[in-house]
A protein has these predicted regions:
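A conserved short coil-to-beta-strand element within the FAD-binding core of flavoproteins
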Residues: 2-16
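Glycine-rich loop(s) and the adjacent beta-strand/alpha-helix scaffold that form part
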Residues: 23-101
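A generic structural-conservation signal
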Residues: 1-2, 85
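Short beta-strand segments that buttress and anchor functional surface loops
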Residues: 18-22
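Short low-complexity, flexible loop/linker segments enriched in glycine and/or proline
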Residues: 14-17, 98-103
Length: 103
């Protein structure tokens, strides 16, 4: 299923059983049979999460997919999930040229 971002996890009787997602204007409720795997990328494009977990890297120009905003991490934490090794961020160091802000 493409272009269908999850918006929140579905909690039932002490466990995550699915996700609420959106495809265009349609809201979908997708129930999992055996579990939910959150494979949502990193969070280097979330200023909030970068400041929280790795303040030294928060001011570095991020590299990678601009969709890496930590949405999956935030959804899991909303239900009490713990996180590990968030200070280890894979990064390609670079810089912006003054006349070329997208460089």
């Amino acid at each position: 299923m493409f272009n269908t971002p999850a918006e929140r996890l579905i909690w039932d009787e002490g466990r995550i059983v699915g996700v609420r997602a959106r495809k265009g204007s349609e809201v979908l409720y997708i129930r999992a049979l055996k579990g939910v795997i959150i494979a949502s990328g990193g969070f280097q494009y979330s200023k909030e999460l970068m400041e929280k977990y790795n303040p030294l890297m928060a001011k570095v120009t991020p590299a990678g997919c601009k969709g890496n905003t930590g949405d999956g991490l935030k959804m899991a934490q909303a239900y009490g999930a713990d996180v590990l090794d968030t200070n280890y961020i894979k990064a390609t160091f670079g810089y912006q040229l003054g006349n070329y802000p997208d460089s």
